[in-house]
């Protein structure tokens, strides 16, 4: 990893000279042990945790997202957990504003912000010089109605005519992404299919956590979810409107249990296996995303003492 010092000044009126200390990011695939390591770093450096897991933003989605229990936080403040209702659609632009406000506040108070999560876009939204188009509920609703009526094919053809590069990067069957791209084109006149270059707005140390036995860890974690009452959690959230949450209802595990409750899948055992398979697939995508970032220092076997020593070394190199 390289420690990032390039890029624009801080948001919300701050400048790089205002930054009192580093921002640390602990990233990597699901199930690798990021949350526990982040707590150790926070205790060592006087830090506070800022959540960068898009599903842990939702209230009540605790077991299935492996939200760190209060006792395991060991007194370390955790920010941006349980802040969204399950019926709210994910909004990275809103998250970016909230997270940067927390990060800048911690820096101003002399604390070390420790960003933790496996949602790669959310991590980059906080750390990098990125901006995101807004949304228009009326436009989105109209496009979603059209998607339900005619399917993704005609919408993808329209996108090809309006923004061919964007259309080429989106599978013709991915209705959700097609709708979002068309919404952005309608609101801004263009759509960027790829993210800009890596350019941090903070002094950043990024540490990646990975495991050679990740597939086994994921299977064990899913088994523990079921034993901990995950099915009951999903059933309770379903009563509270989970099915109406365009984002939350698609979360790993939650979508599979809902499928059983709605008669679209045969059994909870099938849902458990499907959750394990989907989570492993998702972890591979996460790994690929983060491995492309040359700024990340990877800890293949996350020994706490070695990890803390590496973080201290990287902070000292800023």
Curated annotation (Swiss-Prot):
Ligand binding (ATP): 28-35
Pfam family, one: IPPT
EC number in record: 2.5.1.75
Any one GO MF annotation of this record: ATP binding
Region (Interaction with substrate tRNA): 53-56
Site (Interaction with substrate tRNA): 119, 140
UniProt keywords, alphabetically: ATP-binding, Magnesium, Nucleotide-binding, Transferase, tRNA processing
EC class name: transferase
Gene Ontology process terms (BP): tRNA modification
Residues annotated for substrate binding in this entry: 30-35
Cofactor: Mg(2+)
Catalytic activity line of the entry: adenosine(37) in tRNA + dimethylallyl diphosphate = N(6)-dimethylallyladenosine(37) in tRNA + diphosphate
Superkingdom of origin organism: Bacteria
Functional note: Catalyzes the transfer of a dimethylallyl group onto the adenine at position 37 in tRNAs that read codons beginning with uridine, leading to the formation of N6-(dimethylallyl)adenosine (i(6)A).
Record family assignment: Belongs to the IPP transferase family.
Subunit: Monomer.
PANTHER family (alphabetical): TRNA DIMETHYLALLYLTRANSFERASE
Protein known as: tRNA dimethylallyltransferase
Organism in which the protein naturally occurs: Parafrankia sp. (strain EAN1pec)
Taxonomy of the source species: Bacteria, Bacillati, Actinomycetota, Actinomycetes, Frankiales
């Amino acid at each position: 990893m390289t420690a990032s010092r390039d890029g624009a000044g801080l948001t919300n009126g701050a400048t790089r000279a205002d930054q009192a200390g580093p921002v640390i990011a602990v990233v990597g695939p699901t199930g690798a042990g990021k949350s526990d390591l982040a707590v150790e770093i926070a205790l060592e450096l006087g830090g506070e945790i800022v959540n960068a897991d898009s599903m842990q933003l939702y209230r009540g989605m605790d077991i299935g997202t492996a939200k760190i229990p209060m006792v395991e936080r060991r007194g370390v403040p955790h920010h941006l957990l349980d802040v969204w209702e399950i019926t709210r659609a994910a909004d990275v632009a809103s998250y970016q504003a909230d997270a940067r406000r927390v990060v800048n506040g911690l820096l101003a108070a002399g604390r070390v912000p420790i960003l933790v999560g496996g949602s790669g876009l959310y991590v980059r939204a906080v750390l990098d010089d990125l901006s995101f188009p807004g949304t228009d509920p009326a436009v989105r609703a109209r496009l979603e109605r059209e998607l339900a009526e005619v399917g993704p094919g005609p919408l993808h053809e329209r996108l090809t005519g309006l923004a061919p590069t964007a259309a080429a990067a989106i599978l013709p069957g991915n209705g959700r992404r097609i709708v979002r791209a068309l919404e952005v084109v309608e609101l801004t006149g263009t759509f960027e299919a790829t993210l800009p270059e890596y350019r941090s707005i903070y002094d950043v140390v990024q540490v990646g956590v990975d495991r050679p036995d990740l597939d086994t860890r994921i299977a064990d974690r899913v088994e523990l979810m079921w034993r901990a009452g995950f099915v009951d959690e999903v059933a309770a959230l379903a009563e509270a409107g989970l099915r109406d949450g365009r984002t939350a209802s698609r979360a790993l595990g939650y979508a599979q249990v809902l499928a059983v409750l709605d008669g679209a899948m045969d059994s909870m055992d099938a849902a458990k296996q499907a959750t394990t398979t989907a989570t492993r697939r998702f972890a591979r995508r996460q790994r690929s995303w983060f491995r492309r970032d040359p700024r990340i220092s990877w800890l293949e076997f996350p020994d706490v003492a070695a990890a803390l020593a590496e973080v201290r070394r990287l902070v000292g190199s800023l």
